[in-house]
Amino acid sequence: GLLDILKKVGKVA
């Protein structure tokens, strides 16, 4: 879901 993407991006960024 979008939340998963946000969490992944937030983790990388």
Curated annotation (Swiss-Prot):
Please indicate if the UniProt record lists Transmembrane as a keyword.
no
Q: Does this UniProt record's set of keywords contain Lipid metabolism?
A: no
Output the Gene Ontology terms for molecular function. calmodulin binding
- Give TM segment ranges: none
Summed up, the tissue specificity of this protein is: Expressed by the skin glands.
Q: Where in the cell is it found?
A: Secreted
State a GO cellular component annotated for this protein.
extracellular region
Single Gene Ontology BP term? defense response
Q: What keywords tag this UniProt record?
A: Amidation, Amphibian defense peptide, Calmodulin-binding, Secreted
Please list the residues that carry the modification Alanine amide.
Answer: 13
Q: Hey, which family's this protein in? A: Belongs to the frog skin active peptide (FSAP) family.
Protein's job: Has no antimicrobial activity. Inhibits the formation of NO by neuronal nitric oxide synthase (nNOS) at micromolar concentrations. Acts by a non-competitive mechanism, probably by binding to calcium/calmodulin and as a consequence blocking calmodulin attachment to nNOS. In vitro, does not exhibit cytotoxicity towards 60 human tumor lines.
Protein name (Swiss-Prot/TrEMBL): Lesueurin
